[in-house]
């Protein structure tokens, strides 16, 4: 059975070298399971519906792939040791985050330099206040690495499903912006409210998806799965994703 070796991101954070083997989620171990933890930093706040969206993210990964996920939501502070226990965090909000403290800046800098991955998910892209302020503060964290555009040709859009653009609760721009270090995108800036598309309330969805409704929500879920796979397998080779088996697997509906 072939295996895809996980990249440096979990290894650098002390999670060990793990293997992704189709049909064997236990190969990751508990420490290697994907969890979309919520970052607490500055004056930002993540509403409860989107916290549940983070839980749904892991559930959809488990349901659609052979990768393991941990759906239990968790909040981690940027200046606390708990940040370093897992390699993935989401920073979601709708308002200006204010100025991060120096301890928060140092914590995020260390997390990202060790190989952690951060997704900045603007819950109100129409105003853009959260996204702009997050970019401003992250320029203090990694001043030498300005954001760049990731077009649909980037491996992020091929890790499991073949996608032609990012989407979320709103359609948003056709590209993703990212801070790239070495070969890896360590920060993704999303102007699509991805957690809003994943969030559920009771037996239904917490928010409507515009303008594409059900089809757009499915595409948003697929995009979330791709991000999770990218986080787990950060050393994905661009040529590997063209293998016929993977093309067939990612292209079919789940």
Region locations from a protein language model:
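Short alpha-beta junction capping motif
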Residues: 88-131
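Alpha-helical scaffolding within the catalytic cores
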Residues: 73-78, 101-107, 172-175
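N-terminal secretory signal peptides and thylakoid transit peptides that target proteins
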Residues: 1-18
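Extracytoplasmic/secreted envelope proteins and their assembly/folding machinery
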Residues: 51-58, 105, 109, 131, ...
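Sec-exported extracytoplasmic/periplasmic mature domains
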Residues: 62-66, 113-116, 139, 143, ...
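N-terminal signal peptide c-region/cleavage motif recognized by signal peptidases
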Residues: 22-24
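Aromatic-Pro/Gly-enriched surface loop or interdomain linker
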Residues: 26-88, 95, 194-195, 207-254
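An acidic, glycine-rich "communication" segment
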Residues: 35, 125-207, 211-225, 250-251
């Amino acid at each position: 059975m072939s295996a895809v070796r996980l990249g440096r991101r979990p290894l650098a954070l002390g999670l060990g070298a793990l293997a992704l083997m189709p049909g064997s989620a236990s190969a990751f171990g508990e420490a290697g399971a994907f969890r979309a933890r919520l970052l607490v930093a500055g004056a930002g706040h993540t509403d409860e519906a989107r916290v549940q969206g983070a839980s749904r993210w892991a559930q959809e990964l488990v349901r659609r792939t052979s990768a393991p996920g941990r759906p239990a939501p968790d909040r981690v502070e940027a200046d606390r040791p708990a940040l370093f226990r897992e390699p993935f965090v989401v920073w979601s909000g709708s308002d200006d985050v204010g100025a991060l403290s120096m301890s928060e800046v140092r914590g995020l800098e260390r997390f990202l330099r060790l190989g952690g991955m951060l997704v900045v998910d603007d819950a109100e892209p129409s105003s853009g206040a959260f996204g702009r302020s997050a970019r401003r503060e992250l320029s203090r964290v990694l001043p030498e690495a300005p954001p760049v555009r990731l077009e649909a040709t980037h491996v992020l859009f091929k890790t499991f499903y073949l996608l032609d653009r990012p989407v979320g609760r709103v359609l948003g721009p056709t590209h993703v912006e990212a801070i790239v270090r070495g070969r890896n995108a360590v920060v993704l800036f999303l102007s699509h409210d991805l957690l809003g598309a994943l969030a559920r309330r009771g037996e239904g969805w917490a928010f409507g998806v515009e303008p594409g409704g059900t089809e757009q929500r499915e595409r948003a879920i697929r995009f979330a799965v791709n991000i999770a796979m990218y986080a787990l397998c950060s050393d994905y080779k661009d040529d590997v994703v063209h293998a016929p088996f993977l093309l067939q697997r990612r292209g079919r509906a789940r």
